[in-house]
Amino acid sequence: AAAAGLKRCFLPLENLREGSVIGGIDCYGVSTLAELAVLLRGRTPLPEPAVFSEESLPLEETPDFSDLAGQELVKRATLLAAGGRHNILYIGPAGTGKSMIASRLPYILPAMSREERLSVSEIYSISGLLPPDRPLMTKRPYRSPHHTVTGLALSGGGQKPRPGEICLAHEGVLFLDELPEYHAATLEVLRQPLEEH
């Protein structure tokens, strides 16, 4: 609505906080269509539009990359991959910190731009994964699906289309732990997205 040049929009009350994130448009929440009709007819004055402030978001715990002891070469490779937004493959026995290092990747990547935050928030909203107290995703996503994930759950779609793990990792990190345990057909789903990005 804001992109179309509209000046105001009416949303279900439950979505008001999320809608106010957009900016550039006055957002009003209504509980029923009857309430909307009353407002549109001008029988009652419009309330103040919802205002969103990133400062109102609860603080998120951010694991620190400096918490990791040892593995200097792996940490350096991770920093270089993050800086260049490259894919990275960790190889090593269990318990060497591969998952711990990968889980910190979103926190060493550059901060998301406003457009990236809105894009990620839209994906999480339509997936039903946007926390009620956090209408704007500010940290890069980190997704780590189990090796039993299906190709459909990885790519998305289905009878009731939903974003898959690839989409949920948009602008963030998709970590596939125990890569050899994944079915070959499931890994094949990754071919096109990896070739395109």
Annotate the PLM regions.
Residues 79, 135-136, 140-141, 151-174:
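Conserved alpha-helical scaffold flanking the Walker A/P-loop in AAA+ ATPase domains
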Residues 146-150, 162-195:
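Conserved AAA+/SF3 P-loop NTPase catalytic/coupling segment centered on the Walker-B
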